[in-house]
Amino acid sequence: MSDNSQKKVIVGMSGGVDSSVSAYLLKQQGYQVEGLFMKNWEEDDDSEYCTAAEDLADAQAVCDKLGIHLHKINFASEYWDNVFEYFLAEYKAGRTPNPDILCNKEIKFKAFLEFADEVLDADYIAMGHYVRRSFPENGEKPQMLRGLDGNKDQSYFLYTLSHEQVARSLFPVGDLEKPEVRRIAEEQGLITAKKKDSTGICFIGERKFTDFLSRYLPAQPGNIESPEGEVLGQHQGLMYHTLGQRKGLHIGGRKGGGGNEEPWFVAEKDLKRNVLIAVQGQDHPMLKSEGLIASQLHWVEREPIRDVVKCTVKTRYRQQDIPCTIIPIDDENIKVIFDEPEIAVTPGQSAVFYQGDVCLGGGIIEKRIKYTQA
């Protein structure tokens, strides 16, 4: 009999292949496994996007196949209060937030963990995220590690977790590559084996982002200008654009000074004038940053960084690691200097720090340190 047989794990069942295989693997490892399906968004009448019922049906089918009980919980009000309102406020302020990070912080590893703990008497929770964790002995703090599949690693979205949360969490697919996860699901006859991965922001689903956002925030059209002040076109609202963006400006055929035909990129948002500044060419100095200032810091160890640290950083998901130096300003703010200038550093997004495979934590980008040519 496995040592795990006395341990109860509540798996977040999303109706996707990763959580399905997570539940199967934990059962194979001898744990007492139960599922919990979260409803985080009250669907509108638009049946085209209404996937919650389908996801629940898939989660139930998988649990039935594995012989485990599926609990259901509605976290829609917590989601609205703690994730969605922040998301809207950030967009209103001209920043580009990442709601998936906040959803993990406030819902999946807080509200979910508390419910699993207090109501379901769980020893652990488990999620289908592609991350790993250490299992230290001698009372050391567990660390969060990148997932083995570099293409799927999701540690960027989980940097707000504390070592206590990591200690209570299991990530069964973190040691696997995605094709292997699908192969296991197929072998076990799980209905989710070929289900495509969900994309887009959790509560928006596959629908068009601009249409969704315009329901909650009135659009304010304005000019798109060059750095010299030439009007290049019109934007429908600053909130629909992010720094470094190329698509969707509708000024593609327009030549710049001297007949320059290079593509246009968003370089800045001028909130006071409601103007989008666009520049030509990905190597334009206005797109580059020497570093950033970050706040709202979360370190996995929960100890503030007080010394200069050499490490790497990601300023967006699926980005190559950038070698950098962290310089503490105080316990709440840090300055980060890149070894080489970086493009499209975006206020509101998260900067997440690593030493090797270990995720140290991260913070919200408050502002970028603009590139100054020598």
Swiss-Prot record:
Query: Which GO molecular function annotations are given, in alphabetical order?
Result: ATP binding; tRNA binding; tRNA-uridine 2-sulfurtransferase activity
Residues at site: Interaction with tRNA?
Answer: 129, 349
Q: Where is this region: Interaction with target base in tRNA?
A: 98-100
Which parts of the sequence are annotated with region: Interaction with tRNA?
152-154, 316-317
Could you say which residues bind ATP here?
12-19, 38, 128
Q: Which GO terms describe its biological process?
A: tRNA wobble position uridine thiolation
Q: Where in the cell is it found?
A: Cytoplasm
What is the E.C. number? Answer: 2.8.1.13
Recorded GO cellular component terms are: cytoplasm
Record's SUPFAM superfamilies?
Adenine nucleotide alpha hydrolases-like
Catalytic residues per the record? 103, 202
SS bond partners: 103-202
Record keywords, A-Z = ATP-binding, Cytoplasm, Disulfide bond, Nucleotide-binding, RNA-binding, Transferase, tRNA processing, tRNA-binding
Which InterPro entries does this entry report, sorted A to Z? Answer: MnmA-like, MnmA-like_C, MnmA-like_central, MnmA-like_central_sf, Rossmann-like_a/b/a_fold
Enzyme category, top tier: transferase
What this protein catalyses is: S-sulfanyl-L-cysteinyl-[protein] + uridine(34) in tRNA + AH2 + ATP = 2-thiouridine(34) in tRNA + L-cysteinyl-[protein] + A + AMP + diphosphate + H(+)
Annotated family: Belongs to the MnmA/TRMU family.
Q: What's this chain's function?
A: Catalyzes the 2-thiolation of uridine at the wobble position (U34) of tRNA, leading to the formation of s(2)U34.
| Name of this protein | tRNA-specific 2-thiouridylase MnmA
Classification from the root reads: Bacteria, Pseudomonadati, Pseudomonadota, Gammaproteobacteria, Vibrionales
- The protein's gene is named mnmA
